[in-house]
């Protein structure tokens, strides 16, 4: 069944919150869209809404991390990576804070929200920060694994999540090894590399080439 990675993110947070009381979640007035509202309903005392104050949220997340918590800070990718980049670079990454950044509506896939909300630069901005682990899950199942992996990593992590529903590409048995790609299908004529939402498009492209 098709499901968005942002929806899977919210579900994974709520599930992990049951077994790890160190997890806290914060949002910048978009919990209904980022799906952190799922965690909010389950654990209202561990959820913090900062309003439209992304930079403050990131700095607070760093504070939570240095107090022993595992904070997940969420907003749209265009606002998180754009408006709060200095705080991410200095307060989180430079300080090696154990903060998890989960930004949704990433990439050229949110036409419904207008041209100003298309976050294209976020992945390069985050990959350019030393010490930042970047996960771009291709479907809901992989998104849940990415959230679980982020909890286990001691350091900053960026989860790049999408708005649209995506067909399932992986399943519970598909390996999730940070830093290692999965081979979706074998062939010898061409090699197609893809990440995130583009994996399903790459599969369709391969099918067209094969036809």
Enumerate the language-model features and the residues they cover:
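Aromatic-enriched
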Residues: 163-183
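Short boundary motifs at domain starts and secondary-structure transition points
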Residues: 14-15, 181-185
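Surface-exposed flexible segments
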Residues: 46, 170-173, 204-207
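Thiamine diphosphate
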Residues: 1-160, 165, 175
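Glycine-rich phosphate/diphosphate-binding loop of Rossmann-like nucleotide-binding domains
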Residues: 191-211
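Short hydrophobic beta-strand segments
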Residues: 24-27, 189-194
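Short helix/loop capping segments that flank catalytic or ligand/cofactor-binding pockets
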Residues: 35, 168-169, 201-203
